[in-house]
């Protein structure tokens, strides 16, 4: 999670996707049971889908929901990427 992207609305999955795939590869080389979570700038279901396609097993969210006008709808949108 690059600190400069936290709360920025700029998803690490789009700005620097190599961070996710490199982290997944590094973790798996040590222990294949480690699940990598992606955070920093996750704002929509597209950000989530990209993170999952890069090998992330889940996401961390805060500002993406808090800054939404309808947090229930935002959570539903983000969760839909897992289905």
Indicate residue ranges for each PLM-predicted region.
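Glycine-rich phosphate-binding active-site loops on the catalytic face of alpha/beta enzymes
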Residues: 2-10, 52-75
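Glycine/Thr-rich beta-alpha phosphate-binding loop at enzyme active sites
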Residues: 2-24, 43, 74
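Alpha-helix-loop-beta-strand connector modules within alpha/beta enzyme cores
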Residues: 14-34, 78-83
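Extended, folded domain segments that form the structural surfaces/walls around functional sites
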Residues: 17, 22, 45-54, 65
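Catalytic cores of alpha/beta
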Residues: 30-59
């Amino acid at each position: 999670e690059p600190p400069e992207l936290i709360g920025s609305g700029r998803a690490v999955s789009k700005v620097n996707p190599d961070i996710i795939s490199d982290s997944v590869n590094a973790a798996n080389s040590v222990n294949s049971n480690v699940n990598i979570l992606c955070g920093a700038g996750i704002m929509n279901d597209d950000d989530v889908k990209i993170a999952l396609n890069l090998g992330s097993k889940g996401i961390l969210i805060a500002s993406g929901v808090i800054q939404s006008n309808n947090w229930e709808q935002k959570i539903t949108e983000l969760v839909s990427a897992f289905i």
